[in-house]
Amino acid sequence: MVDTESQICPLSPFGDDDLESPLSEEFLQEMGSIQEISPSIGDDSSGTFAFAEYRCLGSGPGSDGSIITDTLSPASSPSSVSYTPIAGSADDSSSATLNIECRICGDKASGYHYGVHACEGCKGFFRRTIRLKLAYDKCDRSCKIQKKNRNKCQYCRFQKCLSDGMSHNAIRFGRMPRSEKAKLKAEILTCEHDLEDSEVADLKSLAKRIYEAYLKNFNMNKIKARIILAGKASNNPPFVIHDMETLCMAEKTLVAKLVANGIQNKEAEVRIFHCCQCTSVETVTELTEFAKSIPGFSNLNLNDQVTLLKYGVYEAIFAMLSSVMNKDGMLVAYGNGFITREFLKSLRKPFCDIMEPKFDFAMKFNALELDDSDISLFVAAIICCGDRPGLLNVGHIERMQESIVHVLQLHLQNNHPDDVFLFPKLLQKMADLRQLVTEHAQLVQVIKKTESDAALHPLLQEIYRDMY
């Protein structure tokens, strides 16, 4: 999580050259092929996983990169038939309303002809062959009969008519026997139910995979934070930082490593800003490892992986930050400290403006009463966003996000059945987060220009560069 202080290795002060020189691809390579973001971003530590098994169940990918929010329906059945309910009684429906394919060539069947469902073309072909007693030149190639080539090999077409059950003794034009229709409908419903069960199982598996990756990769989550904030933790309560004196005490104990190497001699606002950056860098690394657990992410072009992280990490950070916040303050240093909201507001400008918008967002976000399983899918949807600038494989990323958003929708329906508007509310929060990150990036640029002692970490500087 984004604790204001954390126990990680100290960062030495940055020189002017670090701030002004552009971080090119060469710099990223010096960081170990973007190892600064992740020690193994090029490795698929999650193992091989075919994202295609979580196919999009919606009405089709959006062309503008927006999130698909319309009602999503099960994918079409792999069988040759699908049932479309129509008005009227079952007896009134013809075989055409069942949208059945011709058993011979796959074209749309016009009815039940000579004992099988067949199109007008194959019905006429079989009738002519029988009535005229036509004999075709033998073919040993076992030609595949399809709509586009059904007239090329008449011998194989006739053999397929016979093998699929067409018979002159079973003449019946147009109408299907009621028993046959009832049997067919039962088969269709069974197939659809089996398919839906399979799809639901796949979606649950995806949700479980993402949730487990979330719990594994982040050192702080909502359930842990709520236990600490409620005073129910088994260990000592967090140390409260509410003024300069308690801040200095915390810097000597909780975050002593972060304020070494000359940082301790700078003013309090700069020290706090430095600690915020340290925690942000750590969370970017956690988010990168989490992203690699999202099916399909590690198979993306490396440029697309970096782009998704560049534009998505701060939106994800501020969403997860809400978990450690309440109206009075926020947990820091892995839950060992609690810095008050009023103290952060008392800092001099522009530093006093950093956290207050995050508290405002957190109060509204926490009102949705999401748990970690909800948040994990929400964060995954943020990362896999197909409208980020500079993406190469937009279509694949959009399909990834559509699948995750669909899983999120179904998960919310199951996890929060009484809040029917929770899903659209959460989609709106994605837009709110973009605005929050834009304002934050603008404030950071102001600090960079006006505060000579408040140096930016190189990784965060690269993330902010040309962001918005």
From Swiss-Prot:
Entry's Gene Ontology cellular component terms: nucleus
Disulfide pattern: none
NR C4-type ZnF: 102-122, 139-161
Top-level taxon of origin: Eukaryota
An example molecular function term from Gene Ontology annotations: nuclear receptor activity
InterPro entries per record: 1Cnucl_rcpt, NHR-like_dom_sf, Nucl_hrmn_rcpt_lig-bd, Nuclear_hormone_rcpt_NR1, Nuclear_hrmn_rcpt, PPAR-alpha, Znf_hrmn_rcpt, Znf_NHR/GATA
Region (Disordered): 1-20
Site feature Essential for heterodimerization with RXRA, where: 433
Localization of this protein: Nucleus
Record bears the keyword Zinc: yes
Posttranslational modification: Ubiquitinated by E3 ubiquitin-protein ligase HUWE1; leading to proteasomal degradation. Phosphorylated.
Residue ranges of domain NR LBD in the record: 239-466
Pfam families xref list: Hormone_recep, zf-C4
Record keywords, A-Z: Activator, Biological rhythms, DNA-binding, Lipid-binding, Metal-binding, Nucleus, Receptor, Transcription, Transcription regulation, Ubl conjugation, Zinc, Zinc-finger
Chain residues forming the annotated DNA-binding region: 99-173
Matches recorded under PANTHER family: NUCLEAR HORMONE RECEPTOR, PEROXISOME PROLIFERATOR-ACTIVATED RECEPTOR ALPHA
Family membership noted in the UniProt record: Belongs to the nuclear hormone receptor family. NR1 subfamily.
Record note on quaternary structure: Heterodimer; with RXRA. This heterodimerization is required for DNA binding and transactivation activity. Interacts with NCOA3 coactivator. Interacts with CITED2; the interaction stimulates its transcriptional activity. Also interacts with PPARBP in vitro. Interacts with AKAP13, LPIN1, PRDM16 and coactivator NCOA6. Interacts with ASXL1 and ASXL2. Interacts with PER2. Interacts with SIRT1; the interaction seems to be modulated by NAD(+) levels. Interacts with CRY1 and CRY2.
Protein name, entry field: Peroxisome proliferator-activated receptor alpha
Protein source organism: Phascolarctos cinereus
